[in-house]
């Protein structure tokens, strides 16, 4: 999984810093800026990251790439002969870089060096003092308030407040009986209890394979911080479940997708969550990799809208028909047929998948629902194309913070104004570019790995505060076993419980 990464623990500068307009421009290692959570020992993420902003000798920030490999980055543990860390430097093409590194063992006093032509950049070297734990190290911080501060989590999250407002009190005893009776036969559910920072589960329904995503984030959280004792039900299906119009006797169900006609409690999607947990692991598409693969600059992008996907909604059929009528405006095609009969005369041939990064060769990205919300929206936003988003009853955990005409161009749910909106974007190129930039900034600032961990913890913490009785390890529950520790690189947790914590 990480063999290639481990062979190259730093990148050498081989490309000179050139002017953005063609002439020579001097990059200043002293004036360039470095910041981010990956420089804090206590911020444990699957892949830690920080930023570099290139600045010239006049104090002006670069706004385009000074060269892909101008910075040398090395991560090492001075007390160790070999540091088991994978490092990547990602050029965001706007004068800034993301440096991300995944640790496969825990170390003391980790040293992070950033150099330009042999000179240290900003305040390099950075020393992460004390123990620095890797993702698989089971060493939770007992003080959750301290963890929230280190992670720079927000005090409140509006979507969590909205979702939990339906439930002034939660009785674990009651829901443990009623939810399986109401939903357990027809739906796929997981009944979880977190007790003493251990995770227990009982599944309901036939298709419960997606529990792996929920198991993974819960275990990851318990390795990092003392979780509140909490008992909850997670919906593994696509559609939200709690559709009662009245608030009387509704049940709290946690889902990856919400809707305006349901009262489910929304979590970050399994797709986005998995991309965070597996960054620099088994996934290649994540919120950081997209930022280094945004295609040509805006002025050089193809001026057609692009879409690929399967036939999981009627409006997608209409989109492909529109594309066939207006190929100069829209490049939309199906990669798979499953829900509807494939009529090649109407919808054209099935095409091969293209790399997600190739979407960003186009200025305009169409985001249209599948069975529920299209879970690709975070990745589309963090690119540098403008998103045309279909109006929808479905939403992910962050949709309500997005503003139409600021972060994306809205399109009616039946796509009746899609051509009009595309023509507007073509006629208002600078405004469309500004919307693309605002959407990208929103995603950069709100949908990174630390944001996802904060959301989950705050959600479970605030939900736990609503409980009117103690969560229990119910009959039939089994412990979700933690990941087996690597015997070659064992993790020694240096956090000792005080008497007050015992």
Swiss-Prot record:
Transmembrane segments: none annotated. It holds the Pfam family Filamin. It catalyses: L-seryl-[EGF-like domain protein] + UDP-alpha-D-glucose = 3-O-(beta-D-glucosyl)-L-seryl-[EGF-like domain protein] + UDP + H(+); L-seryl-[EGF-like domain protein] + UDP-alpha-D-xylose = 3-O-(beta-D-xylosyl)-L-seryl-[EGF-like domain protein] + UDP + H(+). A motif (Prevents secretion from ER) lies at residues 499-502. It is found in: Endoplasmic reticulum lumen. Glycans are attached at residues 302, 414. Residues 1-19 form the signal peptide. GO terms for cellular component: cytosol; endomembrane system; endoplasmic reticulum lumen; nucleoplasm. Its main location: endoplasmic reticulum. GO terms for molecular function: EGF-domain serine glucosyltransferase activity; EGF-domain serine xylosyltransferase activity; glucosyltransferase activity; UDP-glucosyltransferase activity; UDP-xylosyltransferase activity. It comes from Homo sapiens. Keywords: Endoplasmic reticulum, Glycoprotein, Glycosyltransferase, Signal, Transferase. Protein glucosyltransferase that catalyzes the transfer of glucose from UDP-glucose to a serine residue within the consensus sequence peptide C-X-N-T-X-G-S-F-X-C. Can also catalyze the transfer of xylose from UDP-xylose but less efficiently. Specifically targets extracellular EGF repeats of proteins such as NOTCH1, NOTCH3, FBN1, FBN2 and LTBP1. May regulate the transport of NOTCH1 and NOTCH3 to the plasma membrane and thereby the Notch signaling pathway. Pathway: Protein modification; protein glycosylation. Filamin repeats lie at residues 24-130. This is Protein O-glucosyltransferase 2. SMART domains: CAP10, IG_FLMN. N-glycosylated. One of its GO terms (biological process) is protein O-linked glycosylation via serine. It is an enzyme of class 2 (transferase). Belongs to the KDELC family. Its EC number is 2.4.1.-, 2.4.2.-.
């Amino acid at each position: 999984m990480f063999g290639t990464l481990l062979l190259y623990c730093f990148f050498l500068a081989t490309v000179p810093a050139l002017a953005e307009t063609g002439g020579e421009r001097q990059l200043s290692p002293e004036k360039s800026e470095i910041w981010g959570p990956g420089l804090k020992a206590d911020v444990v993420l699957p892949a830690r990251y920080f930023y570099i902003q290139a600045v010239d000798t006049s104090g002006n920030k670069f706004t385009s790439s000074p060269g892909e490999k101008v910075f040398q980055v090395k991560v090492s543990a001075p007390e160790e002969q070999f540091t088991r860390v994978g490092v990547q430097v990602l050029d965001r093409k706007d004068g800034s870089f993301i440096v991300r590194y995944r640790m496969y063992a825990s170390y003391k006093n980790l040293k992070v060096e950033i150099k330009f032509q042999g000179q240290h950049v900003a305040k390099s070297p950075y020393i992460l003092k004390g123990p620095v734990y890797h993702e698989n190290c089971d060493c939770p911080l007992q003080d959750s308030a301290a963890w929230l501060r280190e992670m720079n989590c927000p005090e409140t999250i509006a979507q969590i407040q909205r979702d939990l407002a339906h439930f002034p009190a939660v009785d674990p005893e009651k829901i443990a009986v009623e939810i399986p009776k109401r939903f357990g036969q027809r739906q796929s559910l997981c009944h979880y209890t977190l007790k003493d920072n251990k995770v227990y589960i009982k599944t309901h329904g036939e298709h419960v394979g997606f529990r792996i995503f929920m198991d993974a984030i819960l275990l990851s959280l318990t390795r990092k911080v003392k979780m509140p004792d909490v008992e909850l039900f997670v919906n593994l299906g696509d559609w939200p479940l709690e559709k009662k119009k009245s608030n009387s006797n509704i049940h709290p169900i946690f889902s990856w997708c919400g809707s305006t006609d349901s009262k489910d409690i929304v979590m970050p999607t399994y797709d986005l969550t998995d991309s965070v947990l597996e960054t620099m692991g088994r996934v290649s598409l994540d919120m950081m990799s997209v930022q280094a693969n945004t295609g040509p600059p805006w002025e050089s992008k193809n001026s057609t809208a692009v879409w690929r996907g399967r036939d999981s909604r009627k409006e997608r059929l209409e989109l492909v028909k529109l594309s066939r009528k207006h190929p100069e405006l829209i490049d939309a095609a199906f990669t798979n047929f499953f829900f509807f009969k494939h009529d090649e005369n109407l919808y054209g041939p099935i095409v091969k998948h293209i790399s997600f990064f190739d979407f960003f060769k186009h200025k305009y990205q169409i985001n249209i629902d599948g069975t529920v919300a299209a879970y690709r929206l975070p990745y589309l936003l963090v690119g540098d194309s403008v998103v045309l988003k279909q109006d929808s009853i479905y939403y992910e955990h962050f949709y309500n913070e997005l503003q139409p005409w600021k972060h994306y161009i809205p399109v009616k749910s039946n796509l009746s104004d899609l051509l009009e909106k595309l023509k507007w974007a073509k006629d208002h190129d600078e405004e469309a570019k500004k919307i693309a930039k605002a959407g990208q900034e929103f995603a950069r600032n709100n949908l990174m790995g630390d944001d996802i961990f904060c959301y989950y913890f705050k959600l479970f913490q605030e939900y736990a505060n609503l409980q009117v009785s103690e969560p229990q390890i119910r009959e039939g529950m089994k412990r979700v076993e933690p990941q087996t520790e690597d015997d070659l690189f064992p993790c020694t947790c240096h956090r000792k419980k005080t008497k007050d914590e015992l």
